[in-house]
Regions:
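Conserved N-terminal catalytic/coupling substructures associated with nucleotide/phosphate chemistry
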Residues: 1-121
């Protein structure tokens, strides 16, 4: 099993990139906008020949301040989000994992996004 606290530390030490995005998303985030991020990050991972990309909720994208998030709190809500997203993406791509962790006593949500299929983008 992957150590998501360690992964977060590695992601957080660097600025955003084509395959890493940070968002505050303190309590809510528009589903359609989430879909656009999913698609863009998935395509960028493919173009950069990476297996996946990352979207992190609960971190201010400009200041890197950890603000925490209550977005989709609980396993049932996260599983429903995975299901809903798979129904709205081509090739039924779905988040590989959506993992809540705690950093500085605040909930942070890490989305592991698979690369889009090769030779399609």
């Amino acid at each position: 099993m992957e150590d998501y606290n360690k992964i977060f530390d590695q992601l957080w030490q660097h600025a955003e990139s084509e395959i890493v995005e940070f968002k505050k998303a303190e309590s809510n985030f528009d589903f359609d906008e989430l879909g656009r991020y999913f698609s863009a990050l998935s395509n960028e991972a493919n173009l950069r020949e990476r297996d996946f990309a990352w979207l992190v909720f609960g971190v201010h994208d400009k200041t890197h301040t950890i603000v925490g998030t209550s977005y989709k709190d609980g396993e049932v809500a996260l599983n429903k989000l995975k299901q809903d997203m798979s129904q709205h993406t081509s090739d039924n791509l779905v988040f590989r994992e959506i993992v809540p962790i705690h950093v500085e006593d605040k909930r942070v949500l890490i989305f592991k996004i698979p690369a889009s299929p090769r030779n399609i983008v």
